[in-house]
């Protein structure tokens, strides 16, 4: 399997006895979770037959036909009821929220969620806050771009604005520091190019980046 750093890390963070990977593409995450001993069984789920056929080929190549099962499913619609952990990665934050909201009973049956949006992570954190989930741990994955990985369990939390945009309980490592430095650079450019009377958004972002860095004991 030609595994990206991002997919390998996501799979390494699974720890549910039975894991469902939503939008499975080639089925790498579902297979790695089992191969690495992180899950006893997994479901590789996708809305389209094409990606599911790729997943079936991966499952067969790994000789995991008795432990990894392809499931044709529109989001969570057909995810089996014994699923304990839901993984959704490789899509935008808005789509992740839509998937989690579409079949609330399916979402509620899971004990934990592993979510890795490639954009708009603040929407995912807001959804978790509003729907009875608490962020247990976050990581930053650097693989060409920066990708947050959010692990959530059931519970209540109240996020500050900087936490909604830059994470809660973020693991303080080089990737997290590099992400905040990159954000600081980007928003400084935007701030400096924006007319003074329209800088509020950029100024807030820069303030939140500094708060996030302070929480990690880092300097952005």
Language-model segments: what does each one mean?
Residues 27, 31:
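Glycine-rich SAM-binding Motif I of class I
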Residues 16-25:
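Conserved class I S-adenosyl-L-methionine
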Residues 41-46:
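Conserved SAM-binding motif I beta-strand of class I
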Residues 83-90:
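Short SAM/SAH-binding signature in class I
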Residues 53-81:
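S-adenosyl-L-methionine
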Residues 1-17:
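Conserved alpha-helix/loop element of class I SAM-dependent methyltransferases that forms part
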Residues 50:
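Conserved Rossmann-like nucleotide-cofactor binding loop
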Residues 2-3, 94-220:
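Class I S-adenosyl-L-methionine
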